[in-house]
Amino acid sequence: MKRTYQPSKLVRKRRHGFRARLATTGGRKILAARRARGRKRLSA
């Protein structure tokens, strides 16, 4: 059985990147929550 995490920079950016977060209402909520919490990095 192969491991489930097969790293890919492109997929990482597309799925969890800043632009991907801004594209949806839920994603914007995530960014707002991370800003409120004072996260140094908001997204991948």
From Swiss-Prot:
Gene Ontology terms: cellular component: ribonucleoprotein complex; ribosome
PROSITE patterns in the record: RIBOSOMAL_L34
Stretches assigned to coiled coil: none
Keyword Chloroplast: no
Keywords: Ribonucleoprotein, Ribosomal protein
GO MF term list: structural constituent of ribosome
GO BP of this protein: translation
Pfam families documented for this protein: Ribosomal_L34
Family: Belongs to the bacterial ribosomal protein bL34 family.
HAMAP family: Ribosomal_bL34 (MF_00391)
Name of the protein described by the UniProt record: Large ribosomal subunit protein bL34
Lineage of the organism: Bacteria, Pseudomonadati, Pseudomonadota, Alphaproteobacteria, Hyphomicrobiales
Gene name of the record: rpmH
